[in-house]
Amino acid sequence: MSGQQSSPVYKIALGIEYDGSKYYGWQRQNEVRSVQEKLEKALSQVANEPINVFCAGRTDAGVHGTGQVVHFETTALRKDVAWTLGVNANLPGDIAVRWVKAVADDFHARFSATARRYRYIIYNHRLRPAVLAKGVTHYYKPLDAERMHRAAQCLIGENDFTSFRAVQCQSRTPWRNVMHISVTRHGPYVVVDIKANAFVHHMVRNIVGSLLEVGAHNQPESWIAELLAAKDRTLAAATAKAEGLYLVAVDYPDRFDLPKPPMGPLFLAD
């Protein structure tokens, strides 16, 4: 028996999309619904062995993903169609595998990532929406998207984001490098698009909450820069709701050659 060879282990990466409105966040937790738990259950059924997944970004309760990336290891040799169509057949309708790729041993969905990108969608109309109520955040006061965009540009670069960091954040440092931030209007929709090497807890939603104050002319354009410099969470606005937030893309070194599907969500082009 001692001469038997162990089965080879395969490392697989998946692109995942999900509507987070009915889940208590990404991370598996006891007695509440999580995206991770549903995905691991479906993968384990296809692999016929227990599967544990690692993700690029652990989204909070109510937050959505169109560009989430995960990896897992398995001794099960399956065709790509099993990891896509097969897993999707075992998933609830609000979670889906979008792509599959066999990856090198040194790939890690979280630690190999060089940047994450989020988009926050605001439905800016006097009356609330019904069809996309859980996919957008409703804000009834008229917003000046161009004003919001100008105010946000001070956040680009490496900065201390203490003013936009949740009190319970467990990150060792508040410093993050924002590579891109824009605010654009598409009819009644206002979209905040932000890319950074990583994010402190609630960073995007806290930034959006303060940008809403600028867009509604409750605060001057200079206010965002003042908040950034103050390094005081209590001075900034309330945290924006989870419903409008999407993890839309994760960047990795080119050598991993991962698929790059359209970011979206919905009608939004890249």
Swiss-Prot record:
Gene3D superfamilies: Pseudouridine synthase I, catalytic domain, C-terminal subdomain, Pseudouridine synthase I, catalytic domain, N-terminal subdomain
Alphabetical list of InterPro entries matching this protein: PsdUridine_synth_cat_dom_sf, PsdUridine_synth_TruA, PsdUridine_synth_TruA_a/b_dom, PsdUridine_synth_TruA_C, TruA/RsuA/RluB/E/F_N
Record keyword tRNA processing present: yes
Active site: 60
Any GO MF annotation of the entry: tRNA pseudouridine(38-40) synthase activity
Transmembrane spans: none
Domain of life of the native organism: Bacteria
E.C. numbers: 5.4.99.12
Name under which the protein is recorded: tRNA pseudouridine synthase A
Species classification: Bacteria, Pseudomonadati, Pseudomonadota, Gammaproteobacteria, Enterobacterales
Family: Belongs to the tRNA pseudouridine synthase TruA family.
Keywords: Isomerase, tRNA processing
Residues annotated for substrate binding in this entry: 118
HAMAP family in alphabetical order: TruA
